[in-house]
């Protein structure tokens, strides 16, 4: 299982998503605001805003919150900080490649906090380009294997233009080119196939398998990174054997 899918699974098992819903809302609102500021408030011509609103709806964010964030971005209402996007790259325990996407109003503060988290958990922050070449931007649509017809999903996804379907222990991950993401998701959703999550993200080309000690370190590091208010997304190219995953998520 890929690092991103693995981390999503353990968060659901631990109930971390519900306990940190307020923090998730804050991150999504920042993304909606910036997307609207950069590309306007019309979702038809702004795919980034469309993805941000999809993420908000997946978290059951009230429509008023979404609309207010869009209006802040377009300047219809005032308020809000001016954020800058930065991607930090580095290595985690066991040489795992890590990408950290942040949205910050103070780069000096943020880079110091990110560097501290890397160092404290057996990693080190690197320079621009040190690991980004190990990832590709892809659409990812994840389904619970117990809730879908796997054969039908594979057939429909490939016919709609999906590039690949990755089978995990409990999930199926439909991978698309970013330009085909909306089409494939809409086709599958139109056929009644409900996904667990859908987003455009950085997918690792290869993964590094971790032992129990390194896996525990890695998961703690990602948890601390995601808990940082400025961090929007974390991607890593690790793999954890299912038996170790079960032990760590117990």
UniProtKB/Swiss-Prot annotation:
GO cellular component: cytosol
UniProt entry tagged with the keyword Cytoplasm: yes
Localization annotation: Cytoplasm
Gene3D superfamilies recorded: 1.10.10.200, 3.30.70.980
Keyword Disulfide bond carried by entry: no
GO molecular function, one term: DNA binding
Family: Belongs to the TACO1 family.
The protein, known as: Probable transcriptional regulatory protein SYNAS_07390
């Amino acid at each position: 299982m890929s690092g991103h899918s693995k981390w999503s699974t353990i968060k659901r098992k631990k109930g971390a998503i519900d306990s940190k819903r307020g923090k998730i809302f804050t991150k999504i609102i920042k993304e909606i605001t910036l997307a609207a500021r950069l590309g306007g408030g019309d979702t038809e011509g702004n795919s980034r805003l469309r993805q941000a609103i999809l993420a908000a709806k997946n978290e059951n964010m009230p429509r008023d919150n979404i609309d207010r964030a869009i209006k802040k971005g377009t300047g219809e209402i005032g308020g809000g900080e001016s954020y800058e996007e930065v991607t930090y790259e580095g290595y985690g325990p066991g040489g795992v490649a890590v990408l950290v996407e942040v949205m910050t109003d103070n780069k000096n503060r943020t880079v110091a906090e990110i560097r501290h988290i890397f160092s404290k958990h057996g990693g080190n922050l690197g320079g621009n380009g040190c690991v980004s070449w190990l990832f590709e931007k892809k659409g990812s649509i994840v389904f619970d294997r117990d809730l879908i017809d796997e054969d039908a999903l594979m057939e429909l996804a490939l016919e709609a233009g999906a590039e690949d379907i990755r089978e995990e222990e409990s999930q199926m991950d439909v991978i698309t080119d970013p330009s085909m993401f909306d089409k494939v998701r809409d086709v599958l959703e139109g056929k009644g196939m409900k996904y667990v999550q859908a987003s455009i993200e950085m997918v690792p080309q290869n993964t590094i398998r971790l032992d129990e000690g390194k896996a525990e370190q890695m998961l703690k590091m990602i948890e601390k990174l995601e808990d940082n208010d400025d961090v929007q997304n974390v991607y890593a190219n690790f793999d954890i054997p299912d038996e170790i995953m079960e032990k760590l998520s117990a």
